[in-house]
């Protein structure tokens, strides 16, 4: 006999009513959330709103009222959470668990076939040619997202591939980015990667509003997306029409999924937006799909700049592995460069860091390859003469990928009757010093030197740049402002800015915290390397590689400063012109004064460990490296050659002993063959260095 059922108390009845009421409230919340998410997808991704603004606002208000009344019942994926958090003071740097590598590029059908052939060659002969998966190459900002047991916890930009910026608070505001994934609630860590982009219609709306307010507009959707994600105030990012498209799973993929296409299908089922996918078997099918997308890409709601082609099998991807900067199993098939016609209204002359006078064409603004172009470099006076380009001409402007736009043709049949040939200015447009065009040089130059304000400012900008003294946060705009306010004239003055802290704080938009950050970065930059310091000085003809070679050759700044032209010529990559320019630089009283001031300010570096090449296997040899190596980065290969006594140069000449050629060796290979320079493959190189 079972025990009789105990009678319900009034407390039990109230608890039951409360539970039922909670279920009803949650159900109502879910109805609002699902409707809002559906609208957000239609609006921000498809650009096809399904609700009027007033209907959307009413839905949102209804959900917000419920959440304010029942905060304990707020759902983890509520769109109310996507409105922006407190502003940040700075972005945190995060190291990627798995590097975010870039892709190699192909531009023609023959390149595509070569890519697939290389894939086949690397796979076992017993295997059939693999199938490939093709995706749209979205033109946005690459980011990595992490979810812990289904909850969104972190977003990081690609950065340099190894380290990116934590943009979690901004990413939370992206309307189609899921904050909670029920289907992934049992996955300890899910990492997905994709592109944050701005749909074309949203971009046009954003720029239209900016124009109405008199604010600066964005050049293209990609810049707008990147700029939105890098706002310290998440509320600004929340106001921008951003969308996230997922293209890979890097951690947490269920084991039963074996292909890239299946991975994207799974991502779609759990709540992510993915682009169109096509599986192909060979180059011919890949080309057909590429052509079809190229013809219809204008109908897409977002910008793309090509296709991405991946080996579909995840196991084969693992087998094929990676080069130092890109996977062997994937490549980008870029769309051809776009060429458009527009009018060139004027030609202006700019002055660079070394006094180079460069002509810049001012165009009627025109969209080329997704970017609005209003300026175009004309390189030098010789190029102007070659093109016979004049103010008022109709010109063809060409742009491929991220390459700087250039004029490829002048339509002389449409030239105005009153046009006149362009003349090289006789005086500097900034300081009025005489302009000279040295014999055997393409660039005209201002003779004003550091008397010329333009050269002074450009020298300052170069000095603080990432590959020089790397003074983080001290950008061009601040340097120009400091220069105009008389706080800096030479690079040595940068290290005296701590004496002007109050003046810096009073400058427009530069608060106490920003000033402190800049001063801290300046202080940190005092510990550098001799090679960086030499490069930062901005000696004409001395790039990064030459600066490294000079540091290694002389080992000491004083030895370099006192070196004769004959001794300078013993340095790899230093020819007669660079040797003479370097020699003269270190004998100019002003330059010596600046260098002494930098040292007195505390700029220093560790002693250079010079490699004694005498008696080493490659002593007296000069090598050049080209292409991508499978086994190591090129810098590592360079170090191994130097350890054996070789000099490593950046250019091929008759004096070159050997060319180390990796994958995708380009014009240097052809030049080596023409000059009869020995070409060494990677396997032979590894034997040479004992690996």
Swiss-Prot record:
Zn(2+) binds at residues 428, 431, 446, 452. One of its GO terms (biological process) is DNA repair. Keywords: DNA damage, DNA repair, DNA replication, Ligase, Magnesium, Manganese, Metal-binding, NAD, Zinc. The keyword Metal-binding applies. NAD(+) binds at residues 53-57, 102-103, 135, 158, 195, 310, 334. PANTHER family: CHROMOSOME TRANSMISSION FIDELITY FACTOR 18, DNA LIGASE. This is DNA ligase. It comes from Psychrobacter cryohalolentis (strain ATCC BAA-1226 / DSM 17306 / VKM B-2378 / K5). The gene is ligA.
């Amino acid at each position: 006999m079972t025990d009789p059922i105990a009678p319900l108390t009034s407390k039990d009845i109230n608890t039951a009513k409360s539970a039922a009421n909670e279920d009803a409230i949650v159900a109502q919340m879910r109805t609002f959330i699902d409707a809002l998410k559906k609208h957000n997808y239609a609006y921000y991704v498809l650009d096809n709103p399904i609700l009027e603004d007033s209907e959307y606002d009413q839905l949102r208000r209804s959900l917000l009222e419920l959440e304010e009344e029942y905060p304990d019942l707020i759902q983890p994926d509520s769109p109310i959470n996507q409105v922006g958090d407190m502003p940040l003071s700075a972005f945190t740097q995060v190291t990627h668990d798995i590097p975010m590598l870039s892709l190699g590029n192909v531009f023609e059908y023959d390149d595509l076939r070569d890519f697939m052939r290389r894939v086949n060659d690397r796979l076992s002969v017993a295997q059939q040619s693999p199938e490939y998966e093709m995706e749209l190459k979205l033109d946005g900002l690459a980011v990595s997202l992490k979810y812990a047991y289904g909850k969104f916890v972190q977003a990081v930009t690609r950065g340099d591939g190894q380290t990116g910026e934590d943009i979690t608070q901004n990413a939370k505001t992206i309307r189609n980015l899921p904050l909670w994934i029920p289907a992934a609630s049992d996955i300890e860590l899910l990492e997905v990667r994709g592109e944050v982009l701005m749909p074309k219609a949203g971009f046009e709306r954003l720029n239209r509003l900016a124009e109405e307010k008199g604010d600066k507009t964005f050049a293209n959707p990609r810049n707008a997306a990147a700029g939105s994600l890098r706002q310290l105030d998440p509320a600004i990012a929340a106001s921008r029409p951003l969308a996230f498209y997922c293209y890979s799973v890097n951690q947490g993929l269920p084991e039963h999924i074996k292909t890239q296409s299946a991975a994207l299908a799974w991502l779609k089922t759990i709540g992510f937006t993915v682009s169109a996918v096509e599986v192909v078997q060979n180059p011919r099918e890949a080309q057909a799909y590429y052509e079809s997308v190229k013809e219809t890409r204008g109908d897409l709601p977002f910008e793309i700049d090509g296709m991405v082609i991946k080996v579909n099998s995840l196991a084969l991807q693992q087998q094929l592995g990676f080069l130092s900067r890109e996977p062997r199993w994937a490549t980008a098939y870029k769309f051809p460069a776009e060429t458009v016609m527009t009018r060139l209204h004027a030609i202006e002359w700019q002055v660079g860091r070394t006094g180079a006078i460069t002509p810049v064409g001012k165009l009627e603004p025109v969209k080329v390859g997704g970017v609005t172009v209003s300026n175009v470099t004309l390189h030098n006076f010789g190029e102007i003469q070659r093109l016979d380009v004049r103010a008022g001409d109709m010109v063809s402007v060409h742009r491929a990928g991220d390459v700087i736009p250039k004029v490829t043709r002048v339509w002389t049949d449409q030239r105005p009757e009153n046009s006149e040939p362009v003349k090289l200015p006789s005086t500097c447009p900034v300081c009025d010093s005489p302009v000279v065009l040295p014999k055997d040089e393409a660039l005209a130059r201002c003779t004003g030197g550091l008397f010329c304000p333009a050269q002074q400012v450009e020298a300052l900008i170069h000095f603080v740049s990432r590959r020089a003294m790397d003074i983080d946060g001290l950008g061009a705009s601040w340097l120009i402002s400091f220069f105009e306010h008389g706080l800096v004239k030479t690079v040595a003055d940068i290290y005296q800015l701590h004496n002007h802290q109050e003046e810096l704080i009073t400058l427009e938009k530069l608060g106490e915290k920003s000033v402190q950050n800049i001063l801290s970065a300046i202080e940190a930059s005092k510990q550098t390397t001799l090679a960086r310091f030499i490069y930062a000085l901005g000696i004409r003809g001395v790039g990064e590689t030459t600066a490294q070679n000079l540091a290694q050759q002389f080992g000491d700044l004083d030895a370099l400063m006192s070196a004769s032209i004959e001794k300078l010529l013993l340095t790899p990559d230093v020819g007669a012109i660079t040797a003479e320019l370097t020699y003269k630089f270190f004998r100019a009283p002003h330059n010596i004064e600046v260098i002494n001031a930098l040292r007195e300010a505390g700029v220093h570096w560790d002693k250079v460990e010079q490699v004694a090449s005498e008696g080493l296997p490659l002593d007296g040899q000069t090598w050049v490296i080209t292409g991508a190596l499978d086994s190591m980065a090129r810098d590592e290969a360079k170090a191994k050659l130097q350890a054996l006594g070789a000099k490593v140069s950046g250019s091929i000449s008759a004096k070159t002993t050997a060319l180390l050629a990796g994958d995708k060796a380009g014009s240097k290979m052809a030049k080596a063959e023409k000059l009869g320079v020995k070409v060494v493959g990677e396997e032979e190189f590894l034997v040479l260095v004992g690996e």
